A protein has these predicted regions:
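Glycine-rich, basic loop-to-helix element that forms the pyrophosphate-binding segment
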Residues: 67-85, 95
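Active-site-adjacent helix/loop segment of glycosyltransferases
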Residues: 208-309
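Short, acidic, metal-binding catalytic loop of nucleotide-sugar glycosyltransferases
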Residues: 25-34
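Short aromatic/hydrophobic "clamp" motif used to bind/position activated sugar donors
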Residues: 90
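Conserved donor NDP-sugar-binding/catalytic core segment of glycosyltransferases
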Residues: 97-139
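Short, flexible, basic/aromatic active-site loop/helix in glycosyltransferases
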Residues: 139-164
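A short, conserved alpha-helix in the catalytic core of glycosyltransferases
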Residues: 164-218
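A conserved acidic beta->alpha catalytic loop
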Residues: 26, 41-50, 70
Length: 314
């Protein structure tokens, strides 16, 4: 990697007019240079693209805004932005996120180690004291969880660490990772699990995924989809199941994932998630041929053994 690699920051907009201003203002405060800013508008029904361009001009940032004719989902829109970019390092950033001045420099520094392919941030809720994410892990049935979530930050996550995945709210990676493992999987339409899938494929290819605590971020979570709505549960569980079917061995699915799923189902409130869960199971059955095709494509690119270092405790 170059001494001061060029960075491409890719932000996908979808009805983001209410949050993109603070995001762009925070990018203007970044100490690291050079970087380019690319924004992809995913057929927003508001004036996200116009507002984003205006905010960038006001803050003195050069910005390329590309408008898609239809909502292609987060992964496909991100891939479109990456195709327009030229940086050796790529930062995928949500429009409802605000970086600290030294965030980008800390991410680039974490990526300097040759074996590190992806780096993620210490993510705060808007109070800037409560942690939202300090790296992530995956349970046996594909449930994702954030280290540190809802904990006050008192320095307990100040050491860098290798993790299973980092949140797509702010994910930095070397371009060579995408050259090796392929783009984000647009099959996770419209959102959820595309970054988890990318991190798993990168690890399978021999790269490390690291949590870089000096890179800090504020994330106003789920402005677009809404957190803990029926739609959220459906999309999350549909893509969780697809993630498992695509990436894990059949023995793992039978011996660990299925028993864990049964145990987890016995512990949750059925009225809260029953309808979206049943719908998610059904849709995955109907979509199984396409998921198996995606599995075969991934296996063709990645001949290394599957990574199944999940957590067995609820």
């Amino acid at each position: 990697m170059a001494e001061s690699p060029a960075v491409s920051i890719v932000v996908v907009l979808y009805n983001s007019a209410g949050c993109i201003g603070p995001c762009i203002s925070s990018l203007a405060s970044l100490e690291y240079r050079p970087f380019e800013l690319i924004m992809v508008d995913n057929a927003s029904s508001d004036d996200s693209a116009v507002l984003a361009r205006g905010c960038a001009q006001k803050d003195g940032l050069d910005c390329l805004v590309s408008r898609l004719g239809r909502n292609r989902g987060f992964a496909a829109a991100t891939n479109h932005g990456i195709l327009l970019s030229g940086g050796e390092v790529i930062l995928l950033l949500n429009p409802d996120a605000e970086v600290y001045p030294d965030t980008l420099g800390a991410l680039v520094e974490a990526l300097r180690e040759p074996e590190v392919g992806i780096a993620g941030c210490k993510v705060y809720y808007p109070d800037r004291e409560t942690l939202q994410h300090a790296g992530g892990f995956i349970r046996d049935n594909g449930l994702t969880w954030h280290y540190g979530v809802n904990e006050k930050d008192v320095g307990q996550y100040d050491e860098p660490a290798d993790v299973s995945y980092v949140t797509g709210a702010a994910l930095a990676l070397k371009r060579e990772v995408l050259d090796r493992v392929g783009p984000l999987d647009a099959g996770y339409f419209p959102a959820y699990f595309e970054e988890t899938d990318l991190c798993l494929r990168a690890r399978r290819a021999g790269y490390r995924v690291v949590y870089a605590p000096r890179a800090r971020l504020v994330h106003h979570e789920s402005v677009t989809v809404g957190k803990f709505t029926e739609r959220y549960y459906y999309l999350y569980h549909r893509n969780r199941i697809r993630f498992m079917l695509k990436n894990y061995s059949w023995r793992f699915l039978l011996d660990r994932a299925l028993p864990f799923e049964q145990r987890w189902l016995s512990m949750i409130e059925p009225e809260e998630q029953a309808i979206p869960l049943n719908k998610a199971y059904l849709v995955n059955i109907l979509n199984l041929p396409r998921t198996l095709a995606a599995r075969r494509r991934a296996d063709k690119i990645l001949s290394a053994p599957r990574i199944e270092d999940t957590v067995s405790e609820l």
